[in-house]
């Protein structure tokens, strides 16, 4: 049987899909029911919110609405090293996104699942961002592994 040809393969005899790097080694627990992402506009230029993005999951006590705010590397660095910064714990990061979330425009309605207990691969982060996130005391069950 021949190789399955899909589109223009440029004489390539191998078929690959996906990417080669895993984000999670293991996920054990997540926050119940995903939340609506509140800061989609921060991610338009990137086109997606990658799996493993640090986030703050919250539930409105009055309405029960679940929300998630995802943080960029720049926001994390600013919280730790910016002038008058209050430290990484001030962001309220209590989880990391489970999967990639595609973002088409600032009007995209997106939801995400926040993992609160699991093993995440450290190579998914810049070294300085990983060191800052390891100091976060609001998400102690997510372990950075090599």
Task: Locate each region found by the language model.
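Surface-exposed, low-hydrophobicity beta-strand/loop segments enriched in small/polar/acidic residues
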Residues: 1-146
